[in-house]
UniProtKB/Swiss-Prot annotation:
Protein name, per record: Cytochrome b559 subunit beta
Gene expressing this chain: psbF
Function: This b-type cytochrome is tightly associated with the reaction center of photosystem II (PSII). PSII is a light-driven water:plastoquinone oxidoreductase that uses light energy to abstract electrons from H(2)O, generating O(2) and a proton gradient subsequently used for ATP formation. It consists of a core antenna complex that captures photons, and an electron transfer chain that converts photonic excitation into a charge separation.
Alphabetical list of InterPro entries matching this protein: PSII_cyt_b559_bsu (IPR006241), PSII_cyt_b559_CS (IPR006216), PSII_cyt_b559_N (IPR013081)
Family, similarity comment: Belongs to the PsbE/PsbF family.
Keyword Plastid in record: yes
Top-level lineage group: Eukaryota
Cofactor, how bound (note): With its partner (PsbE) binds heme. PSII binds additional chlorophylls, carotenoids and specific lipids.
A Pfam family recorded for this sequence: Cytochrom_B559
GO biological process terms held by the UniProt record: photosynthetic electron transport chain
Organism: Psilotum nudum (Whisk fern)
Subunit structure: Heterodimer of an alpha subunit and a beta subunit. PSII is composed of 1 copy each of membrane proteins PsbA, PsbB, PsbC, PsbD, PsbE, PsbF, PsbH, PsbI, PsbJ, PsbK, PsbL, PsbM, PsbT, PsbX, PsbY, PsbZ, Psb30/Ycf12, at least 3 peripheral proteins of the oxygen-evolving complex and a large number of cofactors. It forms dimeric complexes.
Record-level GO cellular component terms: chloroplast thylakoid membrane; photosystem II reaction center
Length: 39
């Protein structure tokens, strides 16, 4: 029953981490692409 209580917390934490990580990786990728295009 402890797994039933910690699972939603892990899911919300996983969504929060990926919700922040995906735009960050995309933002860093676009910045590096712009620098390569300028050079």
């Amino acid at each position: 029953m402890t797994l039933d209580r910690t699972y939603p917390i892990f899911t919300v934490r996983w969504l929060a981490i990926h919700g922040l990580a995906v735009p960050t990786v995309f933002f860093l990728g676009s910045i590096s692409a712009m620098q390569f295009i300028q050079r």
